[in-house]
């Protein structure tokens, strides 16, 4: 489990950083529609205070994440996947502190020296909207709700997108 993985990391390397990545990816990420977690505390339990940052993923940006007051205690970072050279650097973090492991750790833990993120367009993310890849369907949260979460082409369940999941959990505009 996520809790157990964090516990192992803390036992093995107390100076380590544990940053949940791609927190909104629909299937099995921390806040994915199928994860079973609506809050970090549900995922990490009593170890939640050791989580200082979350990585937002390509399909969301900081303003989308700011809709959840439950994320206020975390630094928001944005990293690029390294699946191909063309995708490197699409997202990045702006750092002004000491460029060392401990400087990065301080920025992640306190926000000092973490000056923001460089973001790609969330709409370009594979999971921004709800959809069904096989049928080439991509729907906004309102459209997905109107369809009852069902693909209008094949009648199978849609994969609910990041924007839909954030709307479900948001407690402010």
Specify the residue positions occupied by each region the protein language model found.
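Phosphate-interacting basic helix/loop segments used at nucleotide- and nucleic-acid interfaces
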Residues: 2-8
């Amino acid at each position: 489990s996520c809790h157990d993985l964090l516990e192992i990391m803390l036992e093995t390397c107390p100076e380590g950083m544990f940053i949940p990545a791609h927190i909104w990816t629909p299937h099995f990420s921390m806040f994915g529609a199928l994860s079973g977690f609506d809050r970090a505390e549900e995922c990490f339990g009593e170890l939640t205070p050791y989580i200082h940052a979350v990585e937002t993923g390509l399909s969301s940006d900081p303003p989308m994440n700011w809709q959840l007051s439950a994320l206020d205690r975390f630094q928001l970072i944005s990293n690029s996947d390294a699946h191909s050279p063309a995708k490197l650097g699409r997202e990045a973090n702006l750092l002004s502190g000491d460029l060392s492991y401990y400087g990065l750790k301080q920025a992640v833990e306190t926000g000092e020296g973490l000056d923001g993120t460089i973001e790609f367009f969330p709409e370009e993310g594979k999971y921004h909207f709800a959809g069904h890849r096989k049928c080439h369907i991509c729907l906004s949260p309102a459209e997905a709700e109107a369809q009852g979460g069902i693909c209008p082409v094949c009648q199978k369940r849609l994969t609910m997108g990041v924007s839909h999941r954030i709307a479900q959990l948001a407690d402010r505009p």
